[in-house]
Regions:
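Gly-rich Lys/Arg/Thr-decorated short loops/hinges at beta-loop-alpha junctions or inter-strand turns
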Residues: 9, 17-24, 76-88, 191-197
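Structural signal for hydrophobic packing residues in well-ordered secondary-structure cores
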Residues: 18, 30, 34, 42-46, ...
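Histidine-anchored nucleotide/phosphate-binding helix
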Residues: 95-109
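Iron-sulfur (Fe-S) cluster-binding modules
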Residues: 1-45, 112-117
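Conserved phosphate/anionic-ligand binding catalytic regions in large, soluble enzymes, centered on
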Residues: 44-64, 106, 161-175, 179-181
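Short coil/turn connectors at secondary-structure junctions
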Residues: 35-38, 44, 68-73, 86-87, ...
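Hydrophobic alpha-helical positions that pack around
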Residues: 127-202
Length: 202
């Protein structure tokens, strides 16, 4: 599922992504579902994270959605420190708009208006394609203010990692995005409750 468009569409062409039903899920979510509906669907799906721990994605979204805060964040951890690991790289290079769409849906579900993609600087093709995808999505009104005319605002920034293995760990990555040395934080509190800049983060 995650790789369905890789090698099928031109990853630098938003129209090709849209032609294979890209951004339809975001449109459906924003126009016919509540944030709780989205969290419930993800919970029922049984989807788990790709990082190895297998934590249920819906549970994490539920924790963040239920956390009371005026500011929340969605962070994509695309910092692969394991030698020879290309799980994230494959998706980022082959289907970057899918990553952006998923992050926007997650943002709606938890009440976030800002996202970050933390990607290794050693992946220049992935970085380049993400930059193009973000620019295209903004031009099409799929990132930024009032997406699909619904009043939902969500934008994404790139942050380049310096290749430190430890920044693959989620709390170290958050510390790095904040501009500090990437060192893991004690848990609890977990990022879904107190994450980036001390705010709920998935």
């Amino acid at each position: 599922l995650a790789l369905r468009n890789c090698g099928v569409i031109d990853p630098e062409n938003i129209d090709e992504y849209i032609a294979v039903h890209g951004y339809e899920a975001l449109g459906k979510v924003l126009t016919s579902m509540t944030p709780k509906d989205v969290v419930d669907v993800v919970l029922a799906s049984g989807i788990r994270g790709r990082g190895g721990a297998g934590f249920p994605t819906g549970r994490k979204w539920q924790f963040a959605a239920n956390s009371k805060s005026d500011k929340k964040y969605v962070v994509c951890n695309a910092d692969e420190g394991d030698p020879g690991a290309f799980m994230d790289r494959s998706v980022l290079e082959g289907d970057p708009h899918a990553v952006l769409e998923a992050m926007a849906i997650a943002g709606f579900a938890i009440g976030a208006d800002e996202g970050y993609i933390y990607v290794r600087a050693e992946y220049p093709i992935a970085v380049h394609r993400l930059q193009i995808a973000i620019k295209q999505a903004r031009e099409y009104g799929l990132l930024g203010k009032n997406i699909f005319g619904t009043g939902f605002n969500f934008d994404i920034q790139l942050r380049l990692g310096a290749g430190a293995f430890v920044c693959g760990e989620e709390t170290a990555l958050l510390t790095s995005i904040e501009g500090n040395r990437g060192e893991p934080r004690p848990r609890p509190p977990f990022p879904a409750v107190k994450g980036l800049f001390g705010q709920p983060t998935i």
